[in-house]
Amino acid sequence: MDELQSQTEREARILARRKRIQERLAALREGDHGGGKEGENKEEIGKGKQQIIESKRRLMRVKYRTDQDVSSVRVAGDDRENQHRIQEEQTRQDLRAKLLAEAEQSARQNAAVAMRWADLFSIEVPQDLYNEIESQRQACERIIASKDKLIGEIKGELKKKDDEFVKTLKRQAEDIDTLLQYMSRQFVEVQNAYKEELDEIENAFLQERSDLLESNRREMQELFDKRSRLEQDFMDRYLAAVEAYQSQLEGHRQMDAEEYHILKIRLETDIQNLEQHLEAMRATYQLNTEKLEYNYRVLKEREKENTQTIESQKKKLSRQRDILSSLKQRYAETDRRYRDDNMKLTDEYKRITEQFKDLQSKFRHFELVDTKKYKEVWGMKEADVAALVRQLLQADKVLHEQQLGWDWRPPDDAVFAPVHGDAGSGGGAAAAATGGAAGGAAAAGGVGPNGEEESEEDAAARVREAELAERLRDGRNWGALGLLCDEAGFLIDIKARNMIERLPKDEQGQVKAEAILRSLGIADGSAFDALLEALSADSNIELRAKGMVAPQGRGMAEEKSDRGGTAVLVHPDEAVRRLKAFVEVYGTGPSRGPGGGGGGGGGMSGPMRVQGAMRRAAEREQEFWSRMTHVISDKHTRVWGALEKQLEKYLALLQERAGSLRDVESLQHQNNELRALLNQYLSSRINDELQIPPTQII
């Protein structure tokens, strides 16, 4: 922005200078054309007037030449300043690019160092551990060396700026001296030219003195007056130009000093930040070194303890074998007793399950009623708030259009969009989800002696597993599964990861994908399709996670059928964020059990869906109140405050004027009374008896 403004000012100065040059050249050409005509009438107009014309021409040429010398200093200074600013901007951009490149490289190196710390705990050979620690130390030293190099470059650039500032001050001082020399030379040359031309004019008029004395005296007086005016105009222009040049020089000097001060402060701040970061890295390195030494000593002590523990456990093993035989006998007796207890508890469980279902239906009924009442109260309060906000907007419109005369733009209609579209839809859905989740949990938890219920649950589980296995075998889904294995491997348990590493290479990918899906709670084909839709490039899962209104995307199966191939996947850097949004929208979560995502909702956790719906409803309500409180911007509020202050001043002025008008009316009334009293005194009969009546004096 500063470069564009300086470029515009420079072009404006160049155009103004060209215009002045063209006007002076036109004046010179008019003088040259007029000179030919004056040569023909030289004898008619006389030597004095001819000398005046030639003197004006010469003075104009002298003035034009000296003005060019004076303005050349400013033009050269403007060009040099423009080049300096362009070079300064290029240097700033280069330094910024170096800082960004070093920050990115340092971030990558720090990430690499941080990632390798976790691998050191799995190394058991001391020599290998020492080699890895040594490599980590070398990596840290390389990071510190790169930052020291960048700090050195910044310090060199700062010193270069100091030297450049000193040189600039010297160059400006030289330009000022040169400008003063040109100005003094201009003054001397113009003064000498005026003196010489005046002498020539006087000599010409002295030659005609004998013939035209009276006329020449009048002309000489006019010429002297004209010369005085010219000298006065010249001095005025000279002083104005001097003041303008001084103000411009002072402005440029202040601008350069401010820019230098700002740049110096910014560079010193960057140096301090880098030094603090360096000290923090050194402290972190020292702390990690001490931790590793301590852990090494602890491991040595534990190794000794483990050796002693193994010897003691061998002795205990023989004793435990004897105890095992006695426990088997006790187990047989206890097993018979617990079977009888299990039959009794099963009957009790069935009775409690029926009571729980009845309680759940009552809970859904009361929740629907409460939600409906809440929606009605919310709708009523929302309408009241909208009416108040519309009144506020109407007042804002009146202030802008009638008081200020400004254009007023109404806010978007989306500001008054209702939070709950249907009074009972949100509560009914939440209650249904709650009931479905509870019923599913009860059905999944009830493993009793009823063989028919168990067979139905097993059949449903087998169907879901078959759907999921079919999706995993589909070659079009391998890209998405590979993306999950690469970016979501942290969801796999450490023990499971160790077991997967022992498998053959061709089986590791499928087993890893299944483990990740179980961690995400994906248990059937519909949940898997929803996950693939969330990982597609054109998915709106993040908008839905934020509670924003977004069009419902098509299913992954429809998308693949329309395209006839694999859908375009999201970038790997955004995969984790998409998975997080998927968990927030569908309420899935890490699951360690064999059922994956639970028993209800197609692999989705019902209670978590309810919590997600309630959270999104709360966010929409919070967003509604935020819109209502910010419908009038801070700028309009400041305008109201300023308008109120000015109207208060205007009211005070009107009140003062009203008081002045009352004073004027009082004075007029007193004046009328005095006039009537004076007329009464003047018309009194006693005035006729006086020797000098007042009527003769007034």
Curated annotation (Swiss-Prot):
Residues 436-449 have a biased composition (Gly residues). Residues 27-47, 76-90 have a biased composition (Basic and acidic residues). GO terms for cellular component: axonemal dynein complex; axoneme; motile cilium. The gene is DRC1. It comes from the Eukaryota. Residues 183-367, 655-685 form a coiled coil. It is found in: Cytoplasm, Cytoskeleton, Cilium axoneme; Cytoplasm, Cytoskeleton, Flagellum axoneme. The lineage of its organism: Eukaryota, Viridiplantae, Chlorophyta, core chlorophytes, Chlorophyceae. Component of the nexin-dynein regulatory complex (N-DRC) a key regulator of ciliary/flagellar motility which maintains the alignment and integrity of the distal axoneme and regulates microtubule sliding in motile axonemes. Plays a critical role in the assembly of N-DRC and also stabilizes the assembly of multiple inner dynein arms and radial spokes. Coassembles with DRC2 to form a central scaffold needed for assembly of the N-DRC and its attachment to the outer doublet microtubules. Disruption phenotype: Defects in DRC1 give the pf3 phenotype characterized by reduced swimming speed and abnormal ciliary waveform characterized by reduced shear amplitude. Severe defects in assembly of the N-DRC and several inner-arm structures seen. Component of the nexin-dynein regulatory complex (N-DRC). Interacts with DRC4 and DRC5. This is Dynein regulatory complex protein 1.
